[in-house]
Amino acid sequence: MGQKVHPIGIRLGVVKKHNANWYASPKQYSEYLINDIQVREYLRKKLDSAMISKIMIERPTGAAKITIATARPGIVIGKKGEDIERLQKELTKMMGVPAQVNIEEITSPDLDAHLVAEGIASQLERRVMFRRAMKRAVQNSMRSGAKGIKVELSGRLGGAEIARTEWYREGRVPLHTLRADIDYSSVRAETTYGTIGVKVWIFRGEILDGMNSVYNPVKEEQTRAPKRRGRGNGNRRNTDRG
């Protein structure tokens, strides 16, 4: 029986980056790993309303660098940067080394699988009809420029006594094409009828240059056509004969 591999795990080193970049000895490896899990749980709990998608952790020698990808950077930074300074001090205590926090703004939340899944889960917890929540998320993502999206819900949908799985897809979602930029996330919605699993796959196009374009993104320059002058603009010749 065939099983689906994790869409991001199979693309690591091909078109996807790791969320943790550090090297450690066998003795330190487990300590760093547990510390990373604690830091991520702490940040997601403390910044629950900041719409955090990813938390990248790097550990250069004698320091720590944490990059938070969020759709609401103002909540993380706070007034005059007070919140982010306080956050850096707390993370320094947790990690035991000076911690630097960087903010990466997500300009298109509808193209981020984790934020879309969190949005669907919050709607289910507010007792919104699950089919309406699925279709609304799919339409918003396709309107924002996604090439394809698939949403899958599992559990006691609509309060049914028997759990089942339903999914909705629009566009293309090529899971076996390694150059395809597939974003994936799975979250849980805690409803009055029990836990409902939410999975989201978003196809955002193909990455042809591999990791070069991932580590060195080049912004496409928008070339505008020259403006055409109307008949009333420009220099006029004086044709009046007096």
UniProtKB/Swiss-Prot annotation:
Pfam families, A to Z: KH_2, Ribosomal_S3_C
Annotated family: Belongs to the universal ribosomal protein uS3 family.
Cellular component aspect of the GO annotation: cytosolic small ribosomal subunit
Alphabetical list of Gene3D superfamilies matching this protein: 3.30.300.20, Ribosomal protein S3, C-terminal domain
Complexes and interactors: Part of the 30S ribosomal subunit. Forms a tight complex with proteins S10 and S14.
Protein name as annotated: Small ribosomal subunit protein uS3
Region (Disordered): 218-242
Gene giving rise to this polypeptide: rpsC
PANTHER family (UniProt xref): 30S/40S RIBOSOMAL PROTEIN S3 (PTHR11760), SMALL RIBOSOMAL SUBUNIT PROTEIN US3C (PTHR11760:SF19)
